[in-house]
Regions:
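Short, charged, amphipathic alpha-helical segments
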Residues: 33-43
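N-terminal acidic leader/helix
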Residues: 1-31, 54-55
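Short, charged early-sequence alpha-helical segments and their helix-coil boundaries
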Residues: 50-58
Length: 58
C-alpha cells in the first residue's frame, strides 16, 4: 500500500537517488530513508515516465 505522504517525500528526489535507493533496499536490505516503501519509489519512477525494469520489479 502506498501512502500519499510517501509520494510527497520522494517527489523532490532525483531519478538516480530513487534508482539507487531501490537497489539498496532490494539487493542490500537497507531501509529507504524516511521509511518510504519501494512500491512508492517504483510509482514515482512510472509517474516520471520511467519503465521500472530489472531490479525495480523485484
Amino acid at each position: 500500500m502506498i501512502y500519499e505522504w510517501e509520494l510527497e517525500k520522494v517527489k523532490d528526489w532525483t531519478l538516480n537517488e530513487i534508482r539507487n535507493r531501490i537497489w539498496a533496499a532490494v539487493n542490500c536490505g537497507q531501509p529507504v530513508p524516511g521509511n518510504v516503501s519501494v512500491e512508492a519509489l517504483r510509482m514515482e519512477l512510472v509517474k516520471r515516465g520511467e519503465e521500472p525494469i530489472g531490479y525495480h520489479n523485484t
